């Protein structure tokens, strides 16, 4: 279903993971007919589920591996976390934070339905990260920020990768930030459109 993602450099194992997690279960009833289209969709509460190509690109840029401990800021309906959970395997773990209680409940229910036991969903403010389980091998933020929060950099492990859209409501760039021997490097990947980190 997602073979077209190869043109974005998305690997076979990411495409396989996306095919295993049926997107239609992560969107509201009124947009289920569009679940397999490569577009973002509204999931209520002013939030969206990312287009499949964006999920694929972000998974690729995170370079997810077995055993990775991942922090996601912005669970939404849970689709991205579900895909990532397959990529890190049973020995890895996804910690995902959602501030909207209704979405948190929906995502938690979906994770149980899919038998995804390597995901911990937290109801709270993601701007502070999740110090209790830091450091993280990978951190992904699924909403834009005007700057890179220091708390997230502090919670990134050495040789870790942080993906975050940075900008404003009009222009956002997906940044890939690496920490190597305590030094931070930044790379601008592409222009994106996300909801704000609030």
Curated annotation (Swiss-Prot):
Record localization: Cytoplasm
Record keywords: Cytoplasm, Methyltransferase, S-adenosyl-L-methionine, Transferase
Active site: 50
Entry's Gene Ontology BP terms: methylation; protein modification process; protein repair
EC number(s) given by UniProt: 2.1.1.77
GO molecular function terms attached to this record: protein-L-isoaspartate (D-aspartate) O-methyltransferase activity
Catalytic reaction equation(s): [protein]-L-isoaspartate + S-adenosyl-L-methionine = [protein]-L-isoaspartate alpha-methyl ester + S-adenosyl-L-homocysteine
InterPro entries to which the protein is assigned, alphabetical: PCMT, SAM-dependent_MTases_sf
Top EC group: transferase
Ranges in a coiled coil: none
GO CC terms, sorted: cytoplasm
Family of the protein in this entry: Belongs to the methyltransferase superfamily. L-isoaspartyl/D-aspartyl protein methyltransferase family.
Function comment: Catalyzes the methyl esterification of L-isoaspartyl residues in peptides and proteins that result from spontaneous decomposition of normal L-aspartyl and L-asparaginyl residues. It plays a role in the repair and/or degradation of damaged proteins.
PANTHER family the record matches: PROTEIN-L-ISOASPARTATE O-METHYLTRANSFERASE, PROTEIN-L-ISOASPARTATE(D-ASPARTATE) O-METHYLTRANSFERASE
Name under which the protein is recorded: Protein-L-isoaspartate O-methyltransferase
Source organism of this protein record: Thermosipho melanesiensis (strain DSM 12029 / CIP 104789 / BI429)
């Amino acid at each position: 279903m997602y073979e077209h993602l190869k043109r974005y450099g998305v690997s076979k194992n990411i495409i396989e993971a996306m095919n295993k997690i049926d997107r239609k279960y992560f969107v509201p009833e009124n947009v289920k007919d569009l679940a397999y289209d490569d577009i973002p969709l509204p999931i209520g509460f002013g939030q969206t589920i990312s287009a499949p190509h964006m999920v694929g690109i972000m998974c690729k840029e995170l370079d997810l591996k077995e055993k990775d401990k991942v922090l996601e800021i912005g669970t939404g309906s849970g689709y991205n976390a579900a895909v990532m959970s397959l990529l890190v395997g049973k020995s890895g773990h996804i910690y995902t934070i959602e501030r909207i209680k209704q979405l948190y409940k929906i995502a938690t229910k979906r994770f149980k339905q899919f038998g995804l036991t390597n995901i911990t969903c937290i109801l709270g403010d993601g701007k502070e990260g999740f110090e209790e389980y830091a450091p993280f091998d990978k951190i992904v933020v699924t909403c834009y920020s005007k700057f890179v929060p220091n708390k997230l950099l502090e919670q990134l492990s050495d040789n870790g990768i942080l993906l975050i859209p940075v900008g404003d409501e009009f222009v956002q760039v997906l940044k890939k930030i690496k920490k190597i021997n305590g030094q931070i490097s930044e790379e601008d990947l592409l222009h994106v459109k996300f909801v704000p980190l609030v």
